[in-house]
């Protein structure tokens, strides 16, 4: 439910951070 959604959003934020740092 909401906990899974929070974990997914956290994962997306981590990915976005990595992608942003790469550029």
From Swiss-Prot:
Any keyword Secreted?
Answer: yes
Q: Name one GO cellular component term.
A: extracellular region
Q: Which UniProt keywords apply?
A: Amphibian defense peptide, Antibiotic, Antimicrobial, Fungicide, Immunity, Innate immunity, Secreted
List the coiled-coil residues: none
Record's superkingdom?
Answer: Eukaryota
> Which InterPro entries does the record cross-reference, listed alphabetically?
Antimicrobial_19
Assigned protein family: Belongs to the frog skin active peptide (FSAP) family. Pseudin subfamily.
Could you identify this protein by its name?
Pseudin-3
